[in-house]
């Protein structure tokens, strides 16, 4: 086994992209990194572990200060590669708060790297849709976010983060991030007299689009607004030429999973986020 770190996204793509595309939905995060030409890549970790024949057995990507993202080729367990990666990261002093990967791989890496000192932060169901199912629409219509939505949208963002237990969304930073979406046809509001739900095209892969930040305030839940917003945005993304859409759903929330399945999304795998203690 041989560990290799890459200094830019092009060289990483040359070795890893074909492997990652074999499970494009599962690997939508590291694939999205490849298209990013930011100067910050110099601080990233883009790496592979190759077997004795030069084939990629394990892919790793990390954009500090976020989690390490892992993928075992064809989801075939390879503890030798995982152990080597852990040793190399410790040797180079590369630190990160946790690991994000298919459930079994995340657990095996965390056991090896942290000597069992970790906890599960979240479990996400990665889902894929190739065609939107026919379903009744709720009253209202979808529209792009506007500047005058910034009086409420950052607070929805903070509430989303709190409910999903993902990260802290402070209002000034969230406002800045949302403002970047204005005029770009990526952030959408479902409006029924007043704004009632939201969904975002958060990133794209080579062939697909990822729907993120789906949120409906408690006052407007149970009326089908989220279903209508997600279904409509999903169809818009397919109409733009994407071959499929993907999203992450809380694996422990049967309500949201049920909503997405009715729209046409299907389970791909469980992704665990494990934090080191």
Annotate each predicted stretch with a short phrase.
Residues 1-29, 132-167:
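Short amphipathic alpha-helix that is part of the acyltransferase structural core
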Residues 61-66, 161-165, 172-212:
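Acetyl-CoA-dependent GNAT
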Residues 93-102, 237-249:
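Conserved GNAT acetyl-CoA-binding A-motif
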Residues 100-106, 247-257, 274-277:
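Conserved beta-strand-loop-alpha-helix junction that forms the acyl-donor binding cleft
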Residues 110, 260, 265:
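Conserved active-site tyrosine of GNAT-family acetyltransferases
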Residues 77-88, 212-216, 222-239, 258-262:
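Conserved acetyl-CoA-binding loop-helix of GNAT-fold acetyltransferases
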Residues 4-7, 18, 24, 32-92, ...:
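Conserved donor-binding loop and adjoining core beta-sheet/short helix segment
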Residues 63-139, 274:
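Acyl-donor-binding surface of acyltransferase catalytic domains
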């Amino acid at each position: 086994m041989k560990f290799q770190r890459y200094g830019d996204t092009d060289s990483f793509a040359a070795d890893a992209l074909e492997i990652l595309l074999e499970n494009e939905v599962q690997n939508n995060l590291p694939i999205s990194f490849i298209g990013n030409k930011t100067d910050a890549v110099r601080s990233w970790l883009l790496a592979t572990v190759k077997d004795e024949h030069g084939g990629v057995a394990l892919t790793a990507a990390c954009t500090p200060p976020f989690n390490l993202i892992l993928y075992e080729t064809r989801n075939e367990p390879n503890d030798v590669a995982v152990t080597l990666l852990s040793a190399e990261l410790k040797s180079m002093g590369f630190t990160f708060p946790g690991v994000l990967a298919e459930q079994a791989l995340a657990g095996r890496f965390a056991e090896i790297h942290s000597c069992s000192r970790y906890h599960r932060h979240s479990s996400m169901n990665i889902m894929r849709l190739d065609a939107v199912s026919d379903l009744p629409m709720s009253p209202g219509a979808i529209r792009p976010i506007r500047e005058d939505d910034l009086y409420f949208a950052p607070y929805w963002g903070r509430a989303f983060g709190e409910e999903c237990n993902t990260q802290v969304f402070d209002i000034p930073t969230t406002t800045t991030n949302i403002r970047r979406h204005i005029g770009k046809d990526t952030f959408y509001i479902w409006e029924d007299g007043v704004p009632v739900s939201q969904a975002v095209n958060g990133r794209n892969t080579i062939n697909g689009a990822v729907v993120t930040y789906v949120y409906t305030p408690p006052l407007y839940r149970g009326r089908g607004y989220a279903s209508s917003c997600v279904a409509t945005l999903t169809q818009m993304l397919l109409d733009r030429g994407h071959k499929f859409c993907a999203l992450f759903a809380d694996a422990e929330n049967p309500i949201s999973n049920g909503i997405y399945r009715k729209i046409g999304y299907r389970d791909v795998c469980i992704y665990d986020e494990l934090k080191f203690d």
